[in-house]
Every structure is written in structure tokens, then in C-alpha cells.
């Protein structure tokens, strides 16, 4: 076939025109004849389609057709994308359809930058654990957000009755739309019979109307086959919460469990335990485990050492069984480290997250502080997807003024799939708190409380070297013991010389020059003076406890300084044998082996080494972290017999002793000295008594000069613990984090706070009342449809204003000297009280009992037989209404009575003063009442001259005179109103008043449940103005660059530090100087030593003060109440560790930097660790800004300070 093709080509005569056309399929050597190979190649090339046409061919082939333009398509409905879909709401295991709701359609490209849904794509691996400030937080609760969006308050603020937005972003108000009936209009929109399909031609689409859907739902049980077509293929059998089934009943989310009753069938309820325990569980533990197995959230409140950790451990085991994660949060980092060690022994896959440590961050059990979890939630960390349980330990720290807000934020922000486990000491309002958590998360919370202690306590007073029992193990206060202690205290002292202290003066002077000992010596008196005062007390007390076999003992001292002083009084006391000394030596050597040689020689380590070998120790915030951990480990092993500790030791892992001693019953709370609260006493005393070892625990209260009174002791020992009180407050970081996303408004966060719990709990009831009032108002308006009440309403408003001005006049008058004389004995008054009809009375002297909002006066009043209100009682008591008042009160059968009335109920103070027997009336003597009745015998109506108003001209008060003038104007206005003389005036006035009252009730309740009634809303608006003034947000409250930088700052003052970063103020300082300057953002302790700094650092210090003053001036201008937000650099010693941090960054040893200040070593370490966190946040801020030089600088600063003992790994790791 190919040869025939070649022959055909050879016969073709190629013309010039053809050569041009075939230019693309032949070469220059073509002479009119082709070989077989060439012909085959050219034919294949010619027949093979080219990927592109030549320009000449395109010009020849392109053609444009003219078409007629039509506008009919503009009248058609466009094909729109469905943004929502209708989902059925089901209930019960059978999935019974109970209703339907409209839900948004999912967007295909969901990611952490545009969606808060759990269906979004995961972010990068680097952001899995910590998240990013550019991420959107996961939605806290879909149903709750829907409920909030549907509240009347939100609709009034943003939406019209038809659900359409009316307030554009940035506008304070929207369009003023005329009121319409939502239901009627909505039904009209969905009524196909009312659609005019002739006017509009729409595309062929099948609509399912609401009416059709409702008909299907009505017949769901009888016509099951018809509904099958509408059912989705995958049926969900998830049970809906009760709130979706009964909209009129407010669900009770908190359920109190009776933990005193034993669970006989626990094995049947939980046949396969996720974690087996080697001991018999208590009832409250069984209850908690059962509810965890059922997927419920629990709130466990029990005494210290009662076994709450069992619940936490079981939740961790359950998470591992379900292949999910459990997060354990604690108030402080040290507690997280301790729990990490304990959990590591029981569970394999355990991790910990702190500011500077990240161990196994993808473990099934993660330990962290509550602040770290809050940061993860705001940053939308993907790790949250896998979390099944969050365990909040020491929940009673929600009462903490500074950090309590963190607990509330985390609970509010947690996703709905997370099960909550709340562990707390015993508090009186557990149900109230659980109810708030349940309402916020739409979860049932089971409250499991136990007042039973595993080891009962006995309480003693230590007086004159003797113990006097004042409370026995059954909780009974022993008055005989208290009297005996009091009698012993009153006996004269015998001079006693403490032989144990002859060499104690050498204690700390020989150890070191500055730091701990020097600081201790600088207090109020030297160590010697303290020893002379307290030596005998502690020597005899410890000797007595040793003889009575009551060691180990924890002595709670509410001062770091006195902890050191008291232990110095026991210099010659040795409580450990040789074997115990050897064990102590091994533990210490093993612990300090991780330190550099120079750090092992620190005076504090040497001092504690000697002290621990004798079985003595101290534990407070001034110790190095490694020293505190050594003390804790040795105490748990029973190698510390006497421990002087501050109250922070009472919080945390189980470290019980045989006895507990209180060095006093007062503490300084930062403002003044006060008695210990019952909760604080209970928390500390709970360390007494070792479960399984001691029959009872011993608690001793030290008494030196005088005993506390019995009432104080009873309250402290046996009184209820402090209630959980909300410490929720707004911070700039919280506001900016919520403004950058749209899923949760600040108003919603405030509504969900514990502080708004009472108000928000009443919202459903108020909504029901509003609905009821609206129905009554609608019926009333139909009844009044034929009556023109325009003039009546004008008269009514004037009457109500008259009443208000009268009340204001009386309240102002009674606060002045001349006005008070008017309210004298015998003065005639006209008054009404609540539902009591208008009547007359006589004041009995000037005996006035005043409270915050009203005054109470003694009167003799005319008591009618029928005291129900009459139509004329709705009118103000003004002369204009004299002809329409009901005068039935003056019937001769009515008698006078004695009583108390409120000042707010007085309608007129009359000019008449009667001579009465006040004492006889108070004593209810009949003669006194008869004489009074005789003086009123001739009075028949209110228009009598007897009721002429008193002359107020002697009252000299501006507000009184202002109200008096306005009331006179209204009096004249009412007198000239002809409507008063019409025949049906009272009837029409009563109808108008009823309408006015219903409308007022609706407005008041609507205002009560609206956002404008939120307690913290004014503070929010003021902080918004501050942020706008500083340029963190714009007029539409969109977060700007400054705001995004401030979102990175969590551990200190975000405003001041952001200003420094964006003004590039730190660029002129070296890394060491930057470290010194930033130390001012984390140091907040007292110091008497002024740091020595260079002129350049002094310039930087003045720069920080200048920026802080600028920020504070703006806050003061907008009246922002800032509490402990780190903005006060002037009045607080914020710059006390500048020299220390500067030299540390330059490489000076820790031993030498302690000589530069009187601040304790532990406080120095804590400051540098917090400084590292600030540097890390500054590095993140530099990344947001795009400043690579600053990013590198902050990284270098971190490397300079992260060394040696300051960043020594925890012994618990």
C-alpha cells in the first residue's frame, strides 16, 4: 500500500502555490521526487496532528458570529450553590426523628486558617502540639453557638425579626425597620399558594417547603414508609441532649451522686477495668469510675490525700484503652513535674509540656499547666482533636485572684467532645460550679463528694510545752481542752535555758556571705534574736513529738524568712541514724551529679546537705528547684523527719506526715494580716495522717502569748471551706485572640463565665416571661382596638413621671437637716405600699431605719377593710386628679393600725401636723388610736385641706430643687388636660396602664438578658477604646499587625512589650543588655538592693518607663481597671534583677550573681526561666513582623541564659 502511495505522489505535479502550502512538510532539498523513506516520513508528519496551529491558519479559521442580545435571563433566578442543608434531629437508640434543623454546608477547602471545624485539614507538623497564632481555634460548642445566636438579645443587637443582619460591621446601629410579624411573614414566604409564578420565571428546580417537611414530620410514626425516602443513608443514633426535646424546661446539668451508699454490683457495672488497683476502692472512687466508663464528666471533691488521683489514673488508662489522649493540668509547673514521675511509673506513653520542656509531646497522657492548655486552645493545636479527657487538678484554685481566670477560659474554650474531670478539695458550692460547667458545655456533670477522711484528725493546742486536745477525731469541739490550755497560758513562765542552741549562732554566717542567709539576717531582727525568742518552743515541741512517736512532722510557716529562722533553732538536733544518713547522702550525690562542679559548691546546697543529713529541711519558693525536689523525694522516703514549709507544700502529690504543726493562725495575703481561712487550714492539715499507717492524724496549733478565741478556732477548724468564686476578668490578650476569629464573640465569652452563671441560668425563665407578657399584650391590644388612647397615654406618662420626681424629692429631702425635720412626729402623709390601696397615715417621730436603697418609717395608718387596689390608685397623687380619686378609705368603719412603711411609697407629705400619743400607738393602746380616729372623723375625701402639701422651701438641695421644678411643670400640664374630665377616663386609664406595665416588663426583661446587661461589658468597651487608640485594632475591630504581635505575648504585659518591639526600641542594645531590660517584665518581688547598671542600660530603663507611662495614661483616660497585668513599672520594683540577669548573660557563675542581690536563689532561677519564656514569645513576635534580625537576636539571647543550674532538668524527668 505504501508503494502505491509513493507512485501517486510522484505523479503529482507540484506548483508554486502548492509549494507554499506544503512548506511545512518538505525540506529545502526537495526536487520533486521523494524516496520511499522520505515519502513515508513526510506523510506521517503531515497526517499527525500538530499541537498548535500556525498563525496564518488561525487567522483564516477564526470567525465571529453575531448573536441577538436578550435580557430575559436577567429575570430568572440564578442557579445558586446550597450553603445549608436540613438535618434531622434524632433521639434514643432507635434514632427516632424529633425535629429538624438547618446546618451550614461544609466547604471543600477547610484548613486551620479559615475554619474552626474539626473536619478541616490538619496544619503543619510543627504546629501539631503548640498550634499557631495564625490558626483559628476549634469551635467550643456548635449547639451553644447556635443557641447564643438565636437569643433575643443577639437578635435585637444584630438581626431583624426575619433573621437578616441589619447592623453592618463597624456601625453602632442598623436600619430602622418597621415592626413586622415574623411568623406570619415567614409562613407567607413558604406558602406556595401565595407565590406569583407568572411574574417571575425561575429555573426548573424542585423545592421542599417547610410546610411539606412539617407534614412529613407530623406523620412520621403513622407513615413510616413515606419518610424513608427522606432519610439519609447513614443513620445516626446519637442521643440528643434533653434541651432539644423540651425547650420550655431548663435542663439541670449538675447531678449530685450519693457516694455514701455502697455500690454492690460494681463488678457487673464495670466488668473489665481499664486499670486494676491493688486495694479496695472507696465508694466515691467507684462512682467516678462508673461514670467515666459511661462517658460522663465528673466533679470529684474530697479532702487532701483522700484518693482523688485514682480517678485521674483511671481516666488516663481509659484513654490508652480507647487509643485517645488524656491531658492532666495542674496549677503550677512543679506539680506537673511531680505527677510526671508518678504517672511514668504506671503508664508507658506519658509526656509533659511546659514553657521550657517538651518530653514526648505526642504521648497518650500529657501533663501541662493550665496556661499551656489555654495557649493550645487559642492557637488551634491539632493535638486537641485526639483528646478524650481533660483532668483539672486543684480546681479550687479557680479562686486565685491572678490565675483563676485561666481555668474558666479553658473550660469555656474546650471542644464539646472532651470529657471533663474536675478534682478539688471540699467546697460548699460544688453543685453550683458543676451546673455552670454543664450549662457552658451542654454536658451532664456528676458531682461526687465525700467529707470522710481516710485518716481522722485530732486537733491540739501547744501551750507551755503541753498538748491540749480541742477537737477529737469525731469532729467535736472540746471546750474543756480549750479552758485547760487557756489556764496553762495564764500561769507565769519558769525560766528555761535551751541547751540545744549553744552553737546555733554559727549556722548561716559560716555558710555564705549573701543570698539566703544574708537575706534572712536583714529582716526584722537577726537570727540570734529569733533564737532567743523561739528556741525553747521549737526544741521542746520537736523533742515532745519525737518522744510521742509523732514524727515525721510538717510545720507550716507562712513566711519564707521564718522557715529559715525556725530551722536554725534546731542546729544540734539530729533525727537520722547512720543508715538514713547514708541514704540521704546517696540521693543528694545522685541529684547534684547533673550539675557542674561550680554549682555543686553553692552555699545553699552545702547548707541543705548538712541539714538533710540530720533529718531536717525547709521547703519554700526561695529554694533552688533542684533543692526543693531533693527535699520532696527524701520526705516521701521518710528520711526527713521535720520539715518547715510554706503552704505551697500542701498542694500537689500525696506527701502525708504523721502530724502537722501550724506556727500561727494568721498570714499576710499581700495586703494585710488575716486569720487563716477554713479552706487553707483544711488543705494544710490534710497532710496529717498516713493512710494505712496511722489510726489518726495529729494537728497542732502553736500558741505563744495568747490563744485565739473559740469562735475563730471553731470557724477555722470546723467551718466550711471558701466557696468557688469567679475571678473572671478581661485581658487584652483574650480580647485580641477572640477578635481575630468570628466563632466566638467577647460577649459570648463573658456570658459563659462563672461570674455570669446566675444571670444566664435565669435567661430561659425570663424568655418564657417575655413570651407570656407579649401574648397578654397582644390580647390587650385587641381589646383596646376601638379606643383612642393617644391622649390617655400622654396623661399616663406625665403621671408616672410625677411619681418618680416625688420619690426623688423625698429621698433628697430626708438626707438634709431641714428636710429631716419635716418628717416629724404627727406629720400627716398619703402613701401606697405594693399591692395595698392608697391610704393616709401619721408619722411617729423621726425613727428611721435606713438601708442601701430605701428608708423605713413608723406610722399609724388608716387600715381599710378592703385593701385591694382600685383604678384610681394607678394615678399619681396630684391635685389635677382630685375629682376622680376613690374616697372609700374614709369610711367610718375603717380603723387605724401601727406599721412600718417604705419612704418610696409616700405619695405626699402634708402640711398638717396632728397631736398624737406616739408611745401609746407603739404600745398598741386603744385610747391612742381612738384619739387619732377622732381627728380624722370629719375627713371624707382626699381633696380636703388636711392633705395640702407641706412647704418645701426650706430644703436647700440642688437635686431636690431640680426634681421639684420638673414636678411642678408636670402638675401644670396635668391640670390643663381635658381628658381627665371625660366619663370613661378611669376605665381607659386602667387599660393604658396595663399596656404600659406589660411593655415596661418586656423591656426590662429584654434588657436584663441582653448583652448590655453583662457586668464586664463596660470594661470590654473601655479596653476596646484603648486598643483602638494604640493601633491594635481598627474602627471595625479588625485585628491589625500590632494586635497580631500582642497575641504572641502571653506571659507578661502584652501592650508595653508590643510597643517596644514594633518601635524597634531594643535594636540599639546588645543581647546581654536586652536580657537585662526584659527582666523587668518578669520580676515582681521586693528587694532592698539597688542594682548597679551602665548609663546605656539606664537609658533603656527610662525608655521602658516612658512606654509604660504612655500605655497607662491611655488606660486611665478610658478608665480601664487593670489588675496585675504587668503594666506598673513605676511603683513596683520591676528592675531589681537587671544587674543579675546582665551578668548571668555575660557568663558569670550562679554563685557570684547571688552576691549582687538580696533576692533568694529560687526567685532568681524562677525569674530567669520566666525570662526565657518572654524571649521565646518575642521571637514569635519577630516572626509575625518579619524581622529576621530580631528573631536571630532573641534566639541568641535564649542561648546565653539557658545554662547550668538555672536550666538543670527536673529530678522527676
UniProtKB/Swiss-Prot annotation:
Main localisation, per the record? cytoplasm
**Biological process according to GO:** endoplasmic reticulum unfolded protein response; nuclear-transcribed mRNA catabolic process, 3'-5' exonucleolytic nonsense-mediated decay; nuclear-transcribed mRNA catabolic process, non-stop decay; polyuridylation-dependent mRNA catabolic process
The record's annotation in SMART domains points to:
DEXDc (SM00487), DSHCT (SM01142), HELICc (SM00490)
**Binding-site residues for ATP, renumbered to this chain:** 302-309
Q: Which domain of life is it from?
A: Eukaryota
Subcellular locations according to the entry: Cytoplasm
Give the multimer and partner information.
Component of the SKI complex.
The protein's name in its UniProt record:
Putative ATP-dependent RNA helicase C550.03c
Amino acid at each position: 500500500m505504501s508503494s502505491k502511495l509513493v507512485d501517486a505522489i510522484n505523479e503529482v505535479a507540484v506548483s508554486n502555490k502548492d509549494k507554499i502550502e506544503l512548506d511545512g512538510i518538505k525540506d529545502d532539498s526537495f526536487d520533486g521526487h521523494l524516496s520511499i523513506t522520505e515519502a513515508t516520513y513526510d506523510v506521517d508528519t503531515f497526517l499527525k496532528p500538530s499541537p498548535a496551529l500556525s498563525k496564518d491558519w488561525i487567522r483564516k479559521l477564526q470567525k465571529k458570529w453575531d448573536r441577538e442580545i436578550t435580557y430575559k435571563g436577567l429575570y430568572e433566578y440564578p442557579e445558586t450553590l446550597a450553603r445549608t442543608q436540613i438535618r434531622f434531629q434524632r433521639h434514643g437508640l432507635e434514632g427516632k426523628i424529633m425535629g429538624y434543623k438547618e446546618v451550614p454546608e461544609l466547604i471543600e477547602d477547610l484548613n486551620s486558617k479559615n475554619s474552626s471545624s474539626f473536619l478541616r485539614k490538619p496544619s503543619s507538623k510543627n504546629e501539631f502540639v503548640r498550634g499557631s497564632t495564625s490558626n483559628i481555634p476549634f469551635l467550643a460548642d456548635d449547639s451553644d453557638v447556635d443557641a447564643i445566636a438565636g437569643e433575643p438579645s443577639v437578635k435585637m443587637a444584630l438581626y431583624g425579626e426575619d433573621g437578616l443582619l441589619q447592623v453592618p460591621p463597624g456601625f453602632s446601629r442598623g436600619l430602622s425597620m418597621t415592626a413586622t410579624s415574623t411568623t406570619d411573614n415567614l409562613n407567607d414566604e413558604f406558602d406556595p399558594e401565595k407565590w406569583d409564578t407568572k411574574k417571575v420565571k425561575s429555573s426548573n428546580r424542585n423545592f421542599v417547603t417547610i410546610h411539606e417537611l412539617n407534614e412529613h414530620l407530623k406523620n412520621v410514626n403513622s407513615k413510616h414508609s413515606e419518610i424513608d425516602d427522606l432519610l439519609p443513608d447513614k443513620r445516626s443514633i446519637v442521643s440528643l441532649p434533653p434541651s432539644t426535646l423540651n425547650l420550655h424546661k431548663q435542663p439541670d446539668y449538675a447531678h449530685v451522686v450519693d457516694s455514701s451508699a455502697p455500690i454492690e454490683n460494681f463488678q457487673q457495672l464495670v466488668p473489665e477495668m481499664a486499670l486494676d488497683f491493688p486495694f479496695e476502692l472507696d465508694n466515691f472512687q467507684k462512682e467516678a469510675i462508673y461514670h467515666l466508663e459511661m462517658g460522663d464528666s465528673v466533679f470529684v471533691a474530697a479532702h487532701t490525700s483522700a484518693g482523688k488521683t485514682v480517678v485521674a489514673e483511671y481516666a488516663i488508662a481509659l484513654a490508652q484503652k480507647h487509643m485517645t489522649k488524656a491531658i492532666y493540668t495542674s496549677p503550677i509547673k512543679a506539680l506537673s513535674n511531680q505527677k510526671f514521675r508518678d504517672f511514668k511509673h504506671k503508664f508507658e506513653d506519658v509526656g509533659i509540656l511546659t514553657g521550657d520542656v517538651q518530653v514526648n509531646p505526642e504521648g497518650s497522657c500529657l501533663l501541662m499547666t493550665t496556661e499551656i492548655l489555654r495557649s493550645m486552645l487559642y492557637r488551634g493545636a491539632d493535638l486537641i482533636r485526639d483528646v478524650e479527657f481533660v483532668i483539672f487538678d486543684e480546681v479550687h484554685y479557680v479562686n486565685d485572684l491572678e490565675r483563676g481566670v485561666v481555668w474558666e477560659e479553658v473550660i469555656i474554650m474546650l471542644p464539646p467532645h472532651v470529657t471533663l474531670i474536675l478534682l478539688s478539695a471540699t467546697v460548699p458550692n460544688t453543685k453550683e460550679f458543676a451546673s455552670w460547667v454543664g450549662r457552658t458545655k451542654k454536658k451532664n456533670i456528676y458531682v461526687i463528694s465525700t467529707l470522710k477522711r481516710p485518716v481522722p484528725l485530732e486537733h491540739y493546742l501547744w501551750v507551755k510545752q503541753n498538748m491540749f486536745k480541742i477537737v477529737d477525731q469525731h469532729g467535736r469541739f472540746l471546750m474543756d481542752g480549750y479552758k485547760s490550755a487557756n489556764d496553762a497560758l495564764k500561769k507565769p513562765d519558769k525560766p528555761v535555758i535551751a541547751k540545744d542552741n549553744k552553737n546555733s549562732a554559727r549556722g548561716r554566717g559560716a555558710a555564705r556571705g549573701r543570698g539566703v542567709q544574708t537575706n534572712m539576717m536583714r529582716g526584722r531582727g537577726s537570727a540570734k534574736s529569733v533564737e532567743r525568742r523561739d528556741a525553747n518552743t521549737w526544741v521542746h515541741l520537736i523533742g515532745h513529738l519525737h518522744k510521742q512517736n509523732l514524727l515525721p512532722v510538717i510545720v507550716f510557716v507562712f513566711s519564707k524568712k521564718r522557715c529559715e529562722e525556725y530551722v536554725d533553732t534546731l542546729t544540734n538536733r539530729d533525727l537520722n541514724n547512720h543508715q538514713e544518713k547514708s541514704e540521704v547522702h546517696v540521693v543528694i550525690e545522685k541529684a547534684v551529679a547533673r550539675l557542674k562542679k561550680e554549682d555543686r559548691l553553692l552555699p545553699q546546697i552545702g547548707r541543705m546537705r548538712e541539714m538533710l543529713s540530720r533529718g531536717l529541711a525547709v521547703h519554700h519558693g526561695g529554694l533552688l528547684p533542684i533543692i526543693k525536689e531533693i527535699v520532696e523525694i527524701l520526705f516521701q522516703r521518710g528520711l526527713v523527719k521535720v520539715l518547715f514549709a510554706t503552704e505551697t507544700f500542701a498542694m500537689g502529690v500525696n506527701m502525708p506526715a504523721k502530724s502537722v504543726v501550724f506556727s500561727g493562725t494568721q498570714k499576710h495575703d499581700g495586703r494585710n494580716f488575716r486569720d487563716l481561712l477554713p479552706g487553707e487550714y483544711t488543705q494544710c492539715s490534710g497532710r496529717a495522717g498516713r493512710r494505712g499507717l496511722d489510726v489518726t492524724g495529729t494537728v497542732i496549733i502553736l500558741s505563744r502569748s495568747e490563744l485565739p478565741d473559740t469562735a475563730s478556732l471553731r470557724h477555722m477548724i470546723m467551718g466550711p471551706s471558701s466557696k468557688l468564686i469567679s475571678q473572671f476578668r478581661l485581658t487584652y490578650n483574650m480580647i485580641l485572640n477572640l477578635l481575630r476569629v468570628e466563632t466566638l464573640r467577647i460577649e459570648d465569652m463573658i456570658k459563659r463565665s462563672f461570674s455570669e452563671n446566675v444571670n444566664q441560668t435565669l435567661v430561659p425563665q425570663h424568655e418564657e416571661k417575655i413570651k407570656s407578657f407579649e401574648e397578654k399584650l397582644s390580647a390587650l391590644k385587641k381589646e383596646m382596638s376601638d379606643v383612642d388612647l393617644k391622649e390617655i397615654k400622654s396623661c399616663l406618662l406625665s403621671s408616672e413621671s410625677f411619681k418618680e420626681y416625688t420619690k426623688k424629692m423625698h429621698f433628697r429631702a430626708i438626707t438634709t437637716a431641714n428636710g429631716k425635720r419635716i418628717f416629724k412626729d404627727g406629720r400627716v402623709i398619703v402613701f401606697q405600699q405594693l399591692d395595698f390601696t392608697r391610704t393616709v397615715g401619721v408619722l411617729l417621730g423621726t425613727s428611721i431605719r435606713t438601708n442601701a436603697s430605701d428608708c423605713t418609717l413608723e406610722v399609724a395608718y388608716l387600715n381599710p377593710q378592703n385593701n385591694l387596689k382600685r383604678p384610681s390608685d394607678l394615678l399619681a397623687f396630684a391635685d389635677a386628679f382630685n375629682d376622680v380619686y376613690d374616697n372609700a378609705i374614709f369610711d367610718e368603719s375603717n380603723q387605724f393600725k401601727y406599721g412600718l412603711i417604705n419612704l418610696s411609697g409616700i405619695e405626699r407629705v402634708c402640711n398638717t401636723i396632728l397631736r398624737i400619743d406616739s408611745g401609746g400607738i407603739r404600745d398598741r393602746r386603744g385610747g391612742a388610736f381612738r384619739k387619732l380616729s377622732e381627728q380624722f372623723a370629719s375627713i371624707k375625701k382626699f381633696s380636703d385641706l388636711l392633705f395640702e402639701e407641706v412647704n418645701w422651701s426650706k430644703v436647700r438641695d440642688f437635686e431636690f430643687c431640680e426634681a421639684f421644678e420638673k414636678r411642678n411643670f408636670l402638675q401644670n400640664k396635668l391640670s390643663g388636660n381635658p381628658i381627665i374630665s371625660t366619663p370613661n377616663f378611669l376605665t381607659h386609664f386602667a387599660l393604658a396602664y396595663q399596656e404600659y406595665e406589660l411593655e415596661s416588663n418586656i423591656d426590662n426583661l429584654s434588657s436584663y438578658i441582653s448583652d448590655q446587661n453583662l457586668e464586664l461589658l463596660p470594661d470590654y468597651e473601655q479596653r476596646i477604646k484603648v486598643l483602638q487608640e494604640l493601633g491594635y485594632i481598627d474602627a471595625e475591630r479588625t485585628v491589625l499587625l500590632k494586635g497580631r504581635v500582642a497575641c504572641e505575648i502571653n506571659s507578661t504585659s502584652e501592650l508595653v512589650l508590643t510597643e517596644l518591639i514594633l518601635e524597634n526600641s531594643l535594636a540599639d542594645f546588645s543581647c546581654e543588655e536586652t536580657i537585662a531590660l526584659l527582666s523587668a517584665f518578669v520580676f515582681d518581688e521586693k528587694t532592698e538592693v539597688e542594682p548597679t547598671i551602665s548609663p546605656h542600660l539606664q537609658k533603656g530603663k527610662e525608655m521602658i518607663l516612658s512606654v509604660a507611662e504612655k500605655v497607662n495614661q491611655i488606660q486611665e483616660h478610658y478608665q480601664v481597671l487593670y489588675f496585675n497585668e504587668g503594666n506598673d513599672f513605676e511603683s513596683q520594683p520591676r528592675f531589681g534583677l537587671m544587674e543579675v540577669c546582665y551578668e548571668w548573660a555575660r557568663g558569670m557563675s550562679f554563685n557570684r550573681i547571688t552576691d549582687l542581690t538580696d533576692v533568694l536563689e529560687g526567685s532568681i532561677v524562677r525569674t530567669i526561666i520566666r525570662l526565657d519564656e518572654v524571649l521565646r514569645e518575642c521571637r514569635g513576635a519577630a516572626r509575625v513582623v518579619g524581622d529576621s534580625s530580631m528573631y536571630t537576636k532573641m534566639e541568641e539571647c535564649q542561648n546565653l541564659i539557658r545554662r547550668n543550674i538555672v536550666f538543670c532538668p527536673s529530678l522527676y524527668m
